[in-house]
Amino acid sequence: MNNNSSILFGLFDEFLWIRCSGRGSFANSPTVKSLGDDYIASGGRLIVIDLETCSGIDSTFIGTLAGLSRRLLPIGGSVQIASPSERCLSALESLGLDALLSIEPPTAPWRGKVEQIRAALGTENAPSVHLDAKEQTLHVLNSHLTLSEMSEENEEKFRNVTDCLKEELERQKDQ
């Protein structure tokens, strides 16, 4: 992760809270994915992504959230978004994530406790997940494939990206 972003997290009775400060991007989305994967594997069903201090989110970060949500929905779980800025909300909505994620749900178990939750997170960053070049390319590809599967519009929007990433994986295979 670069110095301009941080991922804080905490496990609470009913949910995993992940707070992204700075930019949510391809650089820190593997950390978010790892936290979510571990939580789901342990039986967790509700992941809350706190975007209050997030200055923006890229398509890889959004695709990572979509991937976690698509894993949780069939087992009765969900990904919820807390305090998104207008910029982050617009980015989520532009790719159709408002249909997949619960954005500021009024009856969420964390409602009325947000400040206490944030205070309980402390200041230590989540351990960064470092991927090698091939793993990073695969992560970015999978995030964009997830977004592409959501709508024809997304598929068209990301076709060049996914094609280039597939070609890059082929080149990396030969090295």
Please report, for each region that a protein language model flagged, where it lies by residue.
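STAS-like cytosolic regulatory interaction modules
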Residues: 1-53, 70-175
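Histidine-anchored nucleotide/phosphate-binding helix
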Residues: 65-69
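Residues immediately C-terminal
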Residues: 56
